[in-house]
């Protein structure tokens, strides 16, 4: 009896060892479960419904709550859709001669708003033909005196240059300050207007080279007329009487 119990005890011990070595045993299952729980890659937990947290959004909310400055929004470009109410368009060949003394071609209606800014008191019209009706109406509405000095007398050619008497009459008006602001003009603002301005420069003591350069600058790419330059050179400035008490301001400076 004693031997039999010892043999049975040995057999049971051997069977227990074999059972421990077989795969799928309880100990292996427990070990694998422990490995799965410790390794996050083997976890079967469903995380699809877990909300994501934006750290930047949290920081921005904290800045707003604490009153800290945040980046200002980018400025937007403003578009001007309303055009200027007045178009500033000077007349053809417009230019200043002296203070409150101007020259140009015949002004068109588009240039009338520009002329209004000059507050003209006198206009010397040097062309042979009469000024346009719109031009005369503009002068009448603004109480501007128009002197028509380009009229053709009997026996003269309308294509000839200004007469000596017309030049003297124009310069006497120019040398009177009561006529200012003043505009000297003709059809294109080139030759006849250039003659008056050239003789005025002679009266001011300009040298002939400077007088000719100014005349040709306004005469255009086709150049000036040699006869006009000779006429300016030969003009007798002693015929102009200048009264200091009534002379324009630029004359005494």
From Swiss-Prot:
Chain residue ranges for the region called Disordered: 1-84
Annotated compartments: Cytoplasm
SUPFAM superfamilies documented for this protein: (Phosphotyrosine protein) phosphatases II
PANTHER family (UniProt xref): TYROSINE-PROTEIN PHOSPHATASE (PTHR31126), TYROSINE-PROTEIN PHOSPHATASE OCA1-RELATED (PTHR31126:SF8)
Family, similarity comment: Belongs to the protein-tyrosine phosphatase family.
UniProt GO MF annotations: phosphatase activity; protein tyrosine phosphatase activity
Protein name: Putative tyrosine-protein phosphatase OCA1
Domain Tyrosine-protein phosphatase: 93-249
Highest taxon of the lineage: Eukaryota
Keyword line: Cytoplasm, Hydrolase, Protein phosphatase, Stress response
Gene Ontology terms: biological process: cellular response to oxidative stress
Cited Pfam families: Y_phosphatase2
Bias-annotated ranges (Basic and acidic residues): 1-21
InterPro entries documented for this protein: PFA-DSPs (IPR020428), Prot-tyrosine_phosphatase-like (IPR029021), Siw14-like (IPR004861), TYR_PHOSPHATASE_DUAL_dom (IPR020422)
């Amino acid at each position: 009896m004693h031997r039999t119990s010892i043999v049975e005890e040995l057999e049971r011990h051997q069977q227990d060892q074999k059972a421990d070595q077989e795969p799928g045993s309880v100990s292996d299952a427990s070990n694998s479960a422990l490995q799965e729980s410790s390794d996050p890659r083997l976890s079967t937990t469903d995380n699809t419904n877990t909300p994501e947290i934006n750290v930047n959004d949290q920081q921005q909310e904290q800045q707003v709550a604490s009153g800290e400055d945040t980046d200002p929004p980018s400025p937007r470009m403003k578009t001007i859709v309303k055009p200027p109410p007045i178009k500033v368009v000077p007349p053809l060949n417009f230019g200043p001669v002296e203070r409150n003394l101007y020259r140009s071609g015949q002004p068109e209606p588009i240039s009338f708003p520009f002329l209004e800014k000059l507050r003209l008191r006198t206009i010397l019209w040097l062309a042979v033909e009469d000024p346009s009706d719109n031009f005369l109406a503009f002068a009448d509405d603004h109480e501007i005196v128009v002197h028509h000095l380009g009229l053709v007398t009997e026996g003269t050619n309308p294509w000839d240059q200004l007469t000596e008497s017309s030049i003297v009459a124009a310069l006497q008006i120019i040398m009177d300050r009561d006529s200012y602001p003043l505009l000297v003009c003709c059809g294109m603002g080139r030759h006849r207007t250039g003659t008056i301005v050239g003789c005025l420069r002679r009266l001011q003591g300009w040298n002939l080279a400077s007088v000719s350069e100014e005349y040709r600058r306004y005469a255009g790419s086709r150049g000036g007329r040699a006869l006009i330059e000779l006429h300016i050179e030969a003009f007798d400035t002693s015929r102009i009487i200048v009264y200091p008490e009534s002379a324009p301001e630029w004359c005494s400076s």
